[in-house]
Amino acid sequence: MSSEQYKEMVIIQKTYDMIEYAYVCMRQFPKSEKFTLAAEIKTSMYTLLKLLIAASKKYYKKTTLQEIDIELQFLKTTVRLATQLRN
């Protein structure tokens, strides 16, 4: 296994772990946010995982990596918003 393949596997595993942890955290969301903001975060995390898997299978990764960057920025923003709304 090359170091590039290993790095790809690590980031996919870390994203998987993030999703598991986020589910525990999102159980504490108020009902009003569970079906809107929490659903948006879940969708974004699944999209991120899907894009990472797709990037690991492609030879030319540039456009997929740009999509991953956009999705990750959106996920960061929604999680930050959820944190601020909680306070």
Set out the residue ranges of the language-model regions:
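Amphipathic alpha-helical assembly/interaction segments
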Residues: 1-87
